[in-house]
Curated annotation (Swiss-Prot):
Organism whose genome encodes this protein: Burkholderia lata (strain ATCC 17760 / DSM 23089 / LMG 22485 / NCIMB 9086 / R18194 / 383)
Full protein name: Lipoprotein-releasing system ATP-binding protein LolD
Coiled coil feature spans: none
Region described as Disordered: 1-20
Gene from which the chain derives: lolD
Record localization: Cell inner membrane
BP GO terms, sorted: lipoprotein localization to outer membrane; protein localization to outer membrane
PROSITE patterns named among the record's database cross-references: ABC_TRANSPORTER_1, ABC_TRANSPORTER_2, LOLD
Domain ABC transporter per the UniProt entry, residue ranges: 27-252
Functional summary from the UniProt entry: Part of the ABC transporter complex LolCDE involved in the translocation of mature outer membrane-directed lipoproteins, from the inner membrane to the periplasmic chaperone, LolA. Responsible for the formation of the LolA-lipoprotein complex in an ATP-dependent manner.
Length: 252
């Protein structure tokens, strides 16, 4: 092979590697800025923030209260518009899509878990978990079948017919995790998912999230104040002065 052919082959191999690397990223934020007007002043919460999340990666986001962690999740999830910059989801320009396209991509590729479970109190655990599938216009029978399977994955198969008020705090949060994962999303955005639980229950719920991340190859972006839980993620980033900084790995 002559030098020109060799160079061309090397270039094609490099391009394939770059393309494969791009496909590894489930979620990316580039130059994301978010500002609010408060009391006549412009308050900048996110400042040229950069973030990448690989497939199956568990990323913890830590920072002081009021530092903008929840705002970051809202922007990453397409629930709030950035003032500048862009978010890509599965390689698509998420924040630049029309509202209908963005909603469809969000419903297909993202799951959400909050500190307070936000379950519908009048619905059973089964129907709460089935709800995202029903929104996708899946039949009631098929949606309930898949919801039952996911409830069994989180150890709540026998509790499927119970309403949220009949479940413990840890059980309600496990239902919320099942609801977030039932659509098999590429990434789950979790805002203080264990913040309302006692230490033992929080550890159980977090173990479940880590196990499901491994078995389902689902990425997680987890906002948490708990350094012990953060240390068990693949990476930790700290939000300070509107900018994300990579933290050194902590001993588990």
């Amino acid at each position: 092979m002559n030098d020109r052919a060799t160079a061309f082959a090397d270039s094609r191999q490099h391009n394939r590697q770059d393309s494969a690397g791009m496909q590894e990223y489930v979620l990316q934020a580039r130059g994301v800025t978010k500002a609010f007007v408060q009391g006549g002043f412009n308050v900048q919460v996110l400042n040229n923030t950069e973030l990448t999340v690989r497939r199956g990666e568990k990323l913890a986001v830590v920072g002081a209260s009021g530092s903008g962690k929840s705002t970051l999740l809202h922007v990453l999830g397409g629930l709030d518009e950035p003032s500048a910059g862009e978010v890509s989801l599965l390689g698509k320009p998420f924040t630049q899509l029309a509202e209908r396209e963005r909603n469809e991509l969000r419903n297909r590729a993202l799951g959400f878990v909050y500190q307070f479970h936000h379950l519908l109190p009048e619905f059973t655990a089964l129907d709460n978990v089935a709800m995202p599938l029903r929104i996708r216009r899946m039949t009631t029978e098929d949606a309930r079948e898949q919801a039952q399977t996911m409830l069994e994955r989180v150890g709540l198969g026998p509790r499927a017919k119970h309403r949220p008020g009949e479940l413990s705090g840890g059980e309600r949060q496990r239902v919320a995790i099942a609801r977030a994962l039932v659509t098999k999303p590429a990434c789950v955005l979790a805002d203080e998912p264990t913040g309302n639980l006692d230490g033992t229950t929080a550890d159980t719920v977090f173990n479940l999230m880590l196990e499901l991340s491994e078995t389902l190859e689902t990425s997680f972006v987890i906002v948490t104040h708990d350094p012990d839980l953060a240390a068990r993620c693949d990476r930790i980033m700290r939000l300070r002065d509107g900018v994300l900084h990579e933290e050194p790995a902590l001993p588990v």
